[in-house]
Amino acid sequence: MNGSFDSGGLRLQRHLTRPAGRPGATSGLILCHGFPFGPIDARQSGGTFPELIDRVSSELGWVAMTFTFRGCGGSEGDFSLQGWVDDLRAAIDHLIAETSPSGIWLVGTNTGGSIA
């Protein structure tokens, strides 16, 4: 399910998937995209991640979310490394508020993996 959450007054885009037929607390996963290598890449960062998140949720039975950091994709703001750290903290808070997972795994590619 597509949606958004706030990070430091900025609106960030996210994709959140809940496993079908799994009532109660499950593990959670947040997938973070890497650093964009130009304007086109910045608009498309994490573009295929929603499909991967849907698959993780379906196959593992976990709540799973991906989002675009500030300055990327449909998210507001401009890049800053500290901003990306703040964005991940806000994503964790959002996942907890929305789904109450039993625990959260943080994974990512490139810079997103380093921040996670």
Segments the model singles out, each with a brief description of its role:
Residues 48, 78-99:
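Alpha/beta-hydrolase active-site loop
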Residues 36, 71, 111:
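Short, glycine/serine-rich, charged loops/turns that create anion-binding
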Residues 1-24:
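N-terminal cap/lid segment of alpha/beta-hydrolase-fold proteins
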